[in-house]
Amino acid sequence: MIRIFALAALVGLALGFAGSATAQRPGDGPGPRFEVDPWWPKPLPSNWLMGQAAGIAVDRHDHIWVIQRPRTLTEDERGATLNPPRSLCCAPAPPVLEFDQDGVLVRSWGGQGAGYEWPLIEHGIFVDHQDNVWIGGNDAKDHQVLKFTREGKFLLQIGKADQTRGDADTAHLGRPANMNVDPATNELFIADGYKNHRVIVFDAQTGAYKRHWGANGRPPGDPSVKSFGNPVHCARLAKDGLLYVCDRANNRIQVFKKDGTFVKEFVVAPATRGGGSVWDVDVSHDAPQTWLYNADGENNHVWTLLRDNGQVVSKFGRNGRQAGQFHWVHNLAVDSKGNVYTAEVDTGKRAQRFLFKGVGPVEN
């Protein structure tokens, strides 16, 4: 079995500002260790193939949800669907895929239907405490977030396709990237997004607007602070009520209270250019939620940070196509056992699982 263990971050590669500390030297202190599971997930049924995997989530049953882009398969990948068929394999899988812990596909659905506007480019998925499934999109016309039951029944749409009115508008979105629902208040936090530069909050039941803010808790575009870049790529709640927001292009994680009060920020791999270093984050599931995991699709690492101060402890993964390597790692999620799941876009087109192997000295 191929093993990918957490690798210690190099000094200076990932520095934190505004309340965070510098990275540890290789081998300093304990950190979580991981081993890639090359057999997860199982092959899809029905001759299906996964396209770009643009979101991944774990629900309260420890099932893993992937939103993928069927239209990103090339002709040779979907050769069985051509007329006449080019090859024996394959056909695009439905956009929304639910896997059990063994990696078996247990449910699939998605696509355009009555009463809602399915995104042109799928992007981001979250499953809330009531088993509702939320999705977004990032095409130039995708300015909506959709809510479904786990069976795929449509429930709610926030925003409208092809309608966006900027950061000050409270009824429209701007290419929303991802979302998170607070089980304590049933509020929906949206990372908005690829066009807008803010976090916006709605009632998850009614879709009523609650509040929004930009970088440092200021109004979007406030010249007194460094604004969020595009995209604002994630918004992730911890159990203590802190909200972690991915300012991807600026290589930083900003931390807020749920009311938008700015707390601190962490900068990860500050020299990173291109697509930036902070694509998605999730927290560990130990009682204090000690660790913060950061998917870095430009450097193709998953960084492990101490959640209280942003200090980088370790990383795993590198650019490549083998099990445990990444090409444009786009999202991640953590299950109740501490296992980490990742999703890759561009030509990566896969989901992977990394088994949690306890906390110990990290390996170089």
Label each region the model flagged.
Residues 5-16:
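Bacterial N-terminal signal peptides
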Residues 22-364:
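Eukaryotic scaffold repeat domains enriched in small/polar residues
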Residues 15-23:
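Short, low-complexity disordered leader/linker segments with a strong preference
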Residues 1-2:
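N-terminal secretory signal peptides that target proteins for export/translocation
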